[in-house]
Amino acid sequence: MEGGGEGALPPATMGDPATCQIGIIGMGDMGRLYALRLRDAGWQHVNVCDRPEKYEALQREWEGTGLTVLRDGHLVSRQSDFIVYSVEAGNIHSVVKEYGPSTKVGAIVAGQTSVKAPEREAFETYLPRDVYIVSCHSLHGPHVDPRGQPLVLIQHRAPDEKMRLVERILACLESRYVYM
């Protein structure tokens, strides 16, 4: 697969916390954990969303926090270089079907569902071929300190350089990587 293209950041700037756009689709407990850790680690463009009917409440809750609340996953997907689907395993298929086609060319997409087969199927079915897939799963709950906890990384459809970038971005969790 050829990565990059119109709208994609050059490889040298994609991993720069000042310019890299990170997206979190799903602001439940795990989405919030990831968003806050990324922001606190200095990633300056963390775009988040939840279900459209929660937009106004989410916007009020996170106003002035350094997170950018967007109306829906289309907007998060279109502008983010690294996107994490933080949704329940039972909803991954419908959420990726809805927002996956909007994914920015050359972006890296991850999912953190606990059941990977439906996630992989949804990604392969609905994501454009010109995006990368490096999935993840934190082996702890949202109220457990992630430091030293296992974080599974799955290099599904991505070259090594994209895997290294995901490792760099997720380093803020201070988790122990487990590769599958």
Model-found features: residue ranges?
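Rossmann-fold dinucleotide-binding core
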Residues: 116-180
